[in-house]
Amino acid sequence: MASTKLFFSVITVMMLIAMASEMVNGSAFTVWSGPGCNNRAERYSKCGCSAIHQKGGYDFSYTGQTAALYNQAGCSGVAHTRFGSSARACNPFGWKSIFIQC
């Protein structure tokens, strides 16, 4: 009985560690004020919708979570662009919000 409880406790801890490490290594969207991929940078990696403040260039680092970019605030309307892999462009863009699917 004690060995069964220990076994399930160990399995539970291992699952929690795996889930926590997945959250730490989530996809991330970095934007710069510009020109290009220079000057002030902001990074977005939380699940759900985030407002984009810098628009000089971007880098999306894909690690399993896809993202949708919107031309409207609040991730409203139809997604203009979707990322399912890493992408980078050091040119100005007009997206106003990003939704990272977790």
From Swiss-Prot:
**Gene3D superfamilies reported for this sequence:** 2.60.20.30
Q: Which residues constitute the signal peptide according to the record? A: 1-26
The cellular component terms of Gene Ontology attached to this UniProt record, alphabetical and capped at eight, are:
extracellular region
Q: What domain of life is recorded for the organism?
A: Eukaryota
Sorted alphabetically, which InterPro entries does this protein's record hold? Antimic/Inh_G_crystallin-like, Antimicrobial_MiAMP1, G_crystallin-like
Q: List the disulfide bonds.
A: C37-C90, C47-C102, C49-C75
- Keyword tags: Antibiotic, Antimicrobial, Disulfide bond, Fungicide, Plant defense, Secreted, Signal
Which SUPFAM superfamilies does the record cross-reference, listed alphabetically? Answer: gamma-Crystallin-like
One biological process term from GO is:
negative regulation of growth
* Main location, first listed in the record: secreted
Subcellular compartments: Secreted
- Physiological role: Antimicrobial peptide which inhibits the growth of a variety of fungi, oomycetes, Gram-positive bacterial phytopatogenes and S.cerevisiae in vitro. No activity against E.coli.
Additional comment: Its antimicrobial activity is diminished by calcium and potassium chloride salts.
Name of the protein in its database record:
Antimicrobial peptide 1
- Which organism is this entry from? Macadamia integrifolia
